[in-house]
Amino acid sequence: GVVNEEFEIIAKATCKTNLPRPAEEICEDMAKVALEAVKNAGLEIEQIESVGIGTPGTANSDTGVIEYSNNLGFLNFHVVDLMKKFIDKPCYVENDANAAAYGEYVAGAAKGANDAVCITLGTGVGGGIIINGKIYSGFNFAGAEIGHTVIDPNGPQCTCGRHGCFEVFSSATGLVRMTKEAMFEDKDSIMWKMNEEDGKVSARTAFNAMRAGDKAGKEVVDKYIKYLACGI
């Protein structure tokens, strides 16, 4: 997205990550979609001051290196150096949840607060911490990587290799997995009919089924909320 001086998002563009594939290809697509967003804003790249990159995993904001991102398969990826080859502007990288937390601090729900915590739910579970108006990065830039807190040692395996991590249950990915499991256990669930058009189960499927009075859908939502509360 393109953000103006008032911290307003004035244009957006998106593309699919299409994993797994080389990090260099993903970075090139990121540059293309950034330029598309600039075009959608009716601007030229010369009018843009800098480029910011938010990424899951541990990002060294000092060196511009994504040190480790298990969801993307990145290890010691020099994303800032590569991005500058595509867009010749100052470039910065930060953990995506940290970036979200700082965005809320300067222009959103945490505006006016000195300290704040932000939890992001998506492919994984991320955390961002603001203390005295500054991002708390912690040891090895992983101070708020709450998604890999183990809340059930006997739970399913996480992409990080451990079992029962917070994000195994409380991410959108985890919710989709639990929804599919519930559907196969209950062939009469309305969730089967909800996905007849495209055959895709989303993070909304169980919630929509619950609202329609579906027992299996409600059980999934109850389980999801239980683990979310436990993790928090």
Residue spans for each PLM region:
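Structural signature of FAD isoalloxazine-binding scaffolds in flavoprotein oxidoreductases
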Residues: 142-145
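Glycine-rich phosphate-binding loop and adjoining helix at the ATP-binding site
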Residues: 17-31, 35, 39-51, 57-117
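Glycine-rich phosphate-binding loop plus the immediately following alpha-helix
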Residues: 85, 93-97, 151-189
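Short, ordered coil/turn segments that flank beta-strands lining enzyme active or ligand-binding pockets
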Residues: 5, 62, 131-132, 153, ...
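Short hydrophobic alpha-helix segments
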Residues: 13-15, 70, 139
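Gly/Thr-rich phosphate-binding beta-strand-loop-beta motif of the actin/hexokinase/Hsp70
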Residues: 1-10, 118-135
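Adenine-nucleotide phosphate-binding core of ATP-dependent small-molecule kinases
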Residues: 18-47, 166-169, 176-177, 181-232
